[in-house]
């Protein structure tokens, strides 16, 4: 983890001299005026998507957009890009997954139908999706999951953004688990954005999102659970081109593994550590 922190800290130091110039540019130039994208260096610590704690440093492509009836957020990661991580970490150079992807496209029902479906605090309604794909290095290390359902934006009356989505889940590949190729459970997602203040020539904001998963048949298997929670809390400092983030993420039954379960994957007994906190440091360039 020292290497993780040092690597991201070094990247922060190297880019700090450029942020002032970016902040002075009143009209920054991007490749698109609606497709907002960046390349990030991410250092992760004690993530709990499996029963073993994982640390990594990797490259990420991230994008978000909102245009007419289309609303989008997504990212593509290259695990262990720099060949730095702990003993549990596997990635593109070490017989692990060369690519991990998550996308969240939403399609406005209001705009596609031409009908105003708003009422009360519910501003707009969407056909909402959340698709996750882990390429893995073989079938046993691959995941493909599609959540689909209904989403909405909420008018809170405050200077903040709030959206809610509820999905049913179709599980294709899932690292060889017993719930593959079937409808299996549900997800409720809440996302919010709160601008805080101007700071050091940039914009400081708080972003949060939480996934509540429940109703999975995987809980019928030994050492697995039918539910899980992943809750992320992000403090972000944004400039025209550079951005920096500190992320705290809480996992409950991460990866639907029962916390404290006694496991053996062929290299000795260990206890699952699927509940607790992890974190990320991020530095990125918007283009």
UniProtKB/Swiss-Prot annotation:
Its localization reads:
Cell outer membrane
Annotated InterPro entries: Channel_Tsx, Channel_Tsx-like, Channel_Tsx-like_sf
Tell me the leader sequence span: 1-22
* Pfam families on file: Channel_Tsx
Superkingdom as given in the UniProt entry:
Bacteria
Which Gene Ontology cellular-component terms appear in the entry? cell outer membrane; pore complex
Note the Gene3D superfamilies from the entry.
Answer: Nucleoside-specific channel-forming protein, Tsx-like (2.40.230.20)
What keywords would UniProt list here? Cell outer membrane, Ion transport, Membrane, Porin, Signal, Transmembrane, Transmembrane beta strand, Transport
Q: How does it sit in the membrane?
A: Multi-pass membrane protein
GO molecular function annotation: nucleoside transmembrane transporter activity; porin activity
Give me any GO biological process, just one: monoatomic ion transport
Role noted for this protein: Functions as a substrate-specific channel for nucleosides and deoxynucleosides. Also functions in albicidin uptake and as receptor for colicin K.
NCBIfam families (UniProt xref): PRK15106.1
Family label = Belongs to the nucleoside-specific channel-forming outer membrane porin (Tsx) (TC 1.B.10) family.
- Its recorded name reads Nucleoside-specific channel-forming protein Tsx
The organism is Salmonella typhimurium (strain LT2 / SGSC1412 / ATCC 700720)
Its encoding gene is what? tsx
């Amino acid at each position: 983890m020292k290497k993780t922190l040092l690597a991201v800290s070094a990247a922060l130091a190297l880019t700090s001299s450029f942020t002032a110039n970016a902040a002075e540019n009143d009209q920054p130039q991007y490749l698109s005026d609606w497709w907002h994208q960046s390349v990030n260096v991410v250092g992760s610590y004690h993530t709990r998507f499996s029963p073993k704690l994982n640390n990594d440093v990797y490259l990420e492509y991230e994008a978000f957009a909102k245009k007419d009836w289309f609303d989008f957020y997504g990212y593509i990661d290259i695990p262990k890009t720099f060949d730095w991580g702990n003993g549990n970490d596997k990635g593109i150079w070490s017989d692990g997954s060369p690519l991990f992807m998550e996308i969240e496209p939403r399609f406005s029902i209001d705009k596609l139908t031409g009908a105003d479906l708003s009422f009360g605090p519910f501003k707009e309604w969407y056909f909402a999706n959340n698709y996750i794909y882990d390429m893995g290095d073989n079938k046993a290390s691959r995941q493909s999951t599609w959540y689909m359902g209904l989403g909405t934006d909420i008018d809170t009356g405050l200077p903040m953004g709030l959206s809610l989505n509820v999905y049913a889940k179709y599980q294709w590949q899932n690292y060889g688990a017993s719930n593959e190729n079937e409808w299996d459970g549900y997800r409720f997602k809440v996302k919010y954005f709160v601008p805080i203040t101007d700071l050091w020539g940039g914009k400081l904001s708080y972003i949060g999102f939480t996934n509540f998963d429940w109703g999975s048949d995987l809980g019928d298997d030994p050492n697995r659970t039918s539910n899980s929670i992943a809750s992320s809390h992000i403090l972000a400092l944004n400039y025209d081109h550079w951005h920096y983030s500190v992320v705290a993420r809480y996992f409950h039954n991460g990866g639907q593994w029962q916390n404290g379960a006694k496991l053996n994957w062929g290299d000795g007994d260990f206890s699952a550590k699927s509940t607790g906190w992890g974190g990320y440091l991020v530095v990125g360039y918007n283009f």
